Amino acid sequence: MNGLGRIVIYHTSDIHARLGFGDRLASLVEPGALLVDSGDALAGSSVFYVRDERVATDLARARYSALAVGNREFHYLHRLFLARARKLPAPLVCSNVIDVWRREPVFARELVVRAENTDVRIVALLVPQYRTGSGWEKIFGWRFLAPDVALAEMFDGAQLMPTIVLSHLGLDADRDVAQRWPQLAAILGGHTHETLPQPEMVNNIPIAHPGAYAAHVGRLELIVENGGTRLAAYELMPLL
């Protein structure tokens, strides 16, 4: 990838069904920018299904491009997981969960989206609920891959565009991922409810955590040049 481009991404995480942020968030996101979430936007959980996820209205108003699967989006029962996904206004993404029974897809393993004039690949990582090969796979049909295993599959070939990770692993795990995967453009994280005023730079990769409960949204700006990316600016902006 040659030339100069710009990628602007707005990022939330761990909203946990807080309401009332959608209109303000929509007013902040400029044309051409992406809006993504790193998981746990909903009220339900992996074992508890909420029929009326009221936060979906705010997610729709804000116009998200992608929603990572967090603990609150995932459900062990496929039919409830699928019903939950169908009520959401943006696609779910999860790269390290495999449906070994090959049922109707609930989420994408990756997405390619356009930010201004640049294609961006979005992958997402969920903290594994049990080990690969566990007996639970035969009960529920879900296989959890270690983050490194999933990323190795994602990078099995030429890297043609910047790759952004939506991580629901927690900050410490995000640091480990950045150390081992220098080809990543950025890690936009959540799960541990930490608020970073500025991204941590690990292995020249920005790791951004905007905190929980829709209190803030992070605005990350990357410059694309010479086949890679660099951090140009970051701002943590109040929402609620």
Give residue spans per PLM region:
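Acidic, metal/ion-coordinating pockets
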Residues: M1-L240
